[in-house]
């Protein structure tokens, strides 16, 4: 199957100051399924993404860790790419906004906006941290809400009463970074004149480029009136300098969406593809963005206006999805439901999640809930019990009784055609992003196949040598029907599809390859394609997620204040002792915990320490370290912890304290 259509598809860029979590994966799995669907149709569908690598949070986190922002973002990019690969999320190019391509494009767009009279300079007043000597973004100021008097609220909105306000409206404002009281200062900023493009945006947003819910929301914003958009930030800042303007930088939200263009530009340079064919104002290609509902304002207003004003094409569509909740609630670190991708991967197969998300995504802006009982049921009953079971039941007979060769006839062409007739429905559902509808149809087809096998009972017929031809024909039918099902599921389950192609001894499956069944065809020995979800694995994942919070070595943005000082008498209450590690073993079922037996000279104590990822058990045995010997024992799921070993941490690594030569077990640390 081939097509003349050419498509460029993007997902929102993950921010490069932390690891991916399951909330990120909703969008990237949604995008990947859509792209794979179109590639199977023979369409030139290119998908690009990259890390959003600029801004104050990255600058501050790098400073806290004692590394450069470039080093931080490079490390996080590797982590993101590793997680995406593990979940079979396959971008044609994955880049970073901190790149020469992005700087060149951001500069070009800014200069075109400036030449067109779309850039306005204004003097603004904002909070300034006198200790850090920097202007403070809204989220880096906290204080008492001016509306309801709730304390410890951010500088842009109150999480208690929902009020929005300016940071300067806060009562008793404090810098989150240093703890100092900020002062108001003036600064000249650069603004994009968004109201100038109100009519263009009204026209664009009402022409089918957005979901109906998003269009309706934008109508509210139009009624409230569009405002000029501040696209500059003051030094110090990690980003691209504004050309010819000292100590001014492009705001991260100016160059972040341009990162889509930059990633594609890099792809074009390496593959010999025409960049202008996809981004020229008169382009006949298609451009699609997948984004979360929290950033729709940027993608449905600022972005198309900025593109149009600078002479580039606007998106064909912006597809918006809702948030991920877990067990009906916002993801929570304390409950262990703030689950990072790598914590999930330590316990569960990535395609369980791909299937579950697909079964819940419907093309609307609804939130998606991850309910673990439902998760187990859908994977075990539907995916394993219905689909994989078909291949498992039929392949055994073909492998053992018929030398791995399928029959030369298809005994139920009507049933084969019945499943084949669902193809257009399934494709249409995937293309319209109603994956849940596609999955329901596929499972209905799987039910028909299982009913066919149950009705014909090849396991009973196999006991009668005279019925072996029937067994051969029934199981050949089952294998071919499974082939249709796995083709339908291939955009969702690419890893299982690849394993199925190897089992079927076939070319890569696509939408047209199932027109003809496999007859008189030799297959390979069947190997399990997927196993059932064990609830214990989910529980272990949740435990690991909680432990990840408990063993976090540092807390970000916590200034040392006078209120945190203790007296020498308080410090003297802590009994610090030199301890020898006489035994160390990783705790089974815990991702970070190591069980240590510590010798204090006159006694031994058991301690559970979150150092499993930093050290091998063998290298710890015999080492001296420092422990808190008089800490109240704490009962954990794995046993009683009778103290605490001391370690340093920078957020990326953990380093046990070790005394100089001459220290011995039991020696008091003073």
UniProtKB/Swiss-Prot annotation:
Domain tRNA-binding: 570-670
Protein name in UniProt: Methionine--tRNA ligase
An annotated Gene Ontology molecular function: methionine-tRNA ligase activity
Binding positions (ATP): 333
Keyword Transmembrane (UniProt): no
Cofactor binding description: Binds 1 zinc ion per subunit.
Gene label: metG
Motif range ('KMSKS' region): 330-334
Single Gene Ontology BP annotation: methionyl-tRNA aminoacylation
Family annotation (InterPro entries): aa-tRNA-synth_I_CS, Anticodon_Met, Met-tRNA-synth_bsu_C, Met-tRNA_ligase_1, Met-tRNA_synth, Methionyl/Leucyl_tRNA_Synth, MetRS_core, MetRS_Zn
Stated role: Is required not only for elongation of protein synthesis but also for the initiation of all mRNA translation through initiator tRNA(fMet) aminoacylation.
Motif ('HIGH' region): 14-24
UniProt-listed Pfam families: tRNA-synt_1g, tRNA_bind
Compartment list: Cytoplasm
Assembly and binders: Homodimer.
Catalytic activity, reaction form: tRNA(Met) + L-methionine + ATP = L-methionyl-tRNA(Met) + AMP + diphosphate
Family to which the UniProt record says this protein belongs: Belongs to the class-I aminoacyl-tRNA synthetase family. MetG type 1 subfamily.
EC number(s) stated in the UniProt entry for this protein: 6.1.1.10
A GO term from the CC aspect: cytosol
Cofactor(s) this protein cannot do without: Zn(2+)
Binding residues for Zn(2+): 145, 148, 158, 161
Stored HAMAP family: Met_tRNA_synth_type1
Key words of the record: Aminoacyl-tRNA synthetase, ATP-binding, Cytoplasm, Ligase, Metal-binding, Nucleotide-binding, Protein biosynthesis, RNA-binding, tRNA-binding, Zinc
